Amino acid sequence: MPEERTNTMLRHYPRALAFTAALVLLIGCRAQKVEMIRDTAVTDVSTLPEPAHVRRVAFRVPSESEIADSTVLASVRRGRALLRNTKDSLPRHVGNKLQCVSCHQADGTTRLAMPWVGVYARFPQYRSRAASTQLIEDRINDCFKRSMNGTPLVPESRDMRDIIAYMAFLSSGYPVGAEVDGQGLPRITPQQGDSTRGRTVFTTKCMVCHGTNGQGTDVAPPLWGRDSYNIGAGMARVRTAAAFIKGWMPQNAPGSLSDTEAFDVARYINSQPRPDFRGKERDWPKGGAPPDVAYRTRGRPSAARAK
């Protein structure tokens, strides 16, 4: 589920207490349903006080042995299975051949590979792309609509509840609002990237797994075409794709590409045809679209250079 998120996060203390209570129910109590928390009243964080500091904590993946309740454990495991096998498990909601773990490596438990560790503790969160405060359900559905080129889950559904159960499990013990060492992707110096050079990188480093035309194979997902992520996905941004590629590709030699090679091949991949995203022009309605967003938005009338 990749997208450069704003550093401004909602610190809404009643919701923070609700998160703590929900996590206690989820991890520590006897079998109980964790009620979905829906609060759409707050859509503008400009009137809320900024915290004095944002706490940063160490990366830690919890053990399933910490879950005392068998019903909760079953929910966590089912959520993880949905994220591993998204296309086959949720075919009505997935419009391509990707799984959530195509991008979120090792079930979202790896540092600097867009992990889900601690993510539940960072929601609700103000996101500039929507110019509103989003719940974690909203963020998950954003990925279904964009990265999976599909349709959103019903927020109160069992599927959504189990996915959130897994993410909440990975966030157990993290303070509300805490930043986690190792969240997101590796930092690399932004470059324009060259698609001609990128084609060479793709041919020599990527094609063996992803296919001659980026169509994907049994061992690697499609990178463009109708079975890949759409233009509204975070990975459709060259900077995001380059950071992911730099850190984790090729999988038999992660980190072996230079920053320039990563940007070149990201530029090449994202210059190829892919599905459109209806409503993309409504992204970043208050402005501030990142420079590598390759489509026009209301806040920015001219698109970034796509090739």
Language-model segments: residues:
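Post-cleavage N-terminal segment of exported redox proteins
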Residues: 10-80, 86, 124-196, 296-300, ...
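Sequence/structural segment immediately N-terminal to covalent heme-attachment motifs in c-type
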Residues: 71-107, 189-217, 238-240
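Surface-exposed patches in mature extracellular/periplasmic domains of secreted proteins
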Residues: 88-95, 151-156, 176-180, 253-256, ...
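Secretory-pathway/luminal and periplasmic proteins that interact with or process carbohydrate-rich
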Residues: 89-91, 107-113, 170-175, 272-279
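Short helix/strand-bridging catalytic loops that position acidic/His residues to coordinate divalent metals
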Residues: 184-190, 220-232
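A cross-kingdom marker for long, charged
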Residues: 276-307
